[in-house]
Amino acid sequence: MSSTPVNVTVTGAAGQIGYALLFRIASGQLLGADTPVKLRLLEIPQAVRAAEGTALELEDSAFPLLAGVDVFDDAKRAFEGTNVALLVGARPRTKGMERGDLLSANGGIFKPQGEAINSGAAEDIRVLVVGNPANTNALIAQTHAPDVPAERFTAMTRLDHNRAIAQLAKKLGVPSAEIKKITIWGNHSATQYPDIFHAEVGGRSGAEAVGDQAWIADEFIPRVAKRGAEIIEVRGASSAASAASAAIDHIFTWVNGTPAGDWTSAAIPSDGSYGVPEGLISSFPVTASGGRFEIVQGLELDAFSREKIDASVRELAEEREAVRALGLI
């Protein structure tokens, strides 16, 4: 076992996703069963007391890998020496709120967090933004951390990726483990494009295995893209445990690598691949090795896929222009 604990900062730690996430991190599921962790919980002042209650529960669980828990309401202190940051806390969209108001409110959260990461985080910092609008929140944070390599800022589309695997496995009546090379393209929003044309199921193309283009276009894609809204309607609250599980998956894969013969999906800064403007934080098919994500190259895209990707990328570009106009980047 490594003797030096990894510092993991979780924002919005008193929320439902935070609660579902923290115990799994402390148990070793984020980084592995031989890596001790120190948890640093960041909350707004009015939620610090609740976060302190979660810290007491974490202590009571006596996790062998948990080297300590600290609670903060100051971003500079919370990110001091941090190796892994999960930015979960964000301002949710409320009824009647315009998109500009939402972006502005989240800019007030992610700008200072980016600055705090820039000034105090460890040199090997890795950042995953979970709080929505995740791609653009990640862009805001990354812009305000100019001394941190841009590739260290990512946004989560692993939940969409996992949802796509689950829906395809259910349709075909196979275990989810048999589904390989699913891709989520673009924004973590209703415009995202879940792509099964390069997926593999028992050696066959996912689309060929389904054999029903109408199901792909009219049921699969909207079901995955709008699954969050479906869960809110059924559960009466937003996805929490599944979002936490996807965040664990994202970081674990980033640190430990993708399995041979497979890839995953992550929103990372574009290098211009597949016509996505450079610098946009967009979801791509990626592999991970040596602690780095790499975009899978050379995939052929038909007109259907190209149209779907372009629509989501346009939305990302519009969000970037909106936060630029607000002076947030």
UniProtKB/Swiss-Prot annotation:
One of its GO terms (biological process) is malate metabolic process. InterPro entries: L-lactate/malate_DH, Lactate/malate_DH_C, Lactate/malate_DH_N, Lactate_DH/Glyco_Ohase_4_C, Malate_DH_AS, Malate_DH_type2, NAD(P)-bd_dom_sf. The active site is at residue 188. It catalyses: (S)-malate + NAD(+) = oxaloacetate + NADH + H(+). GO terms for molecular function: L-malate dehydrogenase (NAD+) activity. SUPFAM superfamilies: LDH C-terminal domain-like, NAD(P)-binding Rossmann-fold domains. Transmembrane segments: none annotated. Coiled coil: none annotated. Substrate binds at residues 93, 99, 132, 163. Keywords: NAD, Oxidoreductase, Tricarboxylic acid cycle. Its EC number is 1.1.1.37. It is an enzyme of class 1 (oxidoreductase). NAD(+) binds at residues 12-18, 106, 113, 130-132. Signal peptide: none annotated. PROSITE patterns: MDH. Belongs to the LDH/MDH superfamily. MDH type 2 family. NCBIfam families: MalateDH-SF1, PRK05442.1. Catalyzes the reversible oxidation of malate to oxaloacetate. This is Malate dehydrogenase.
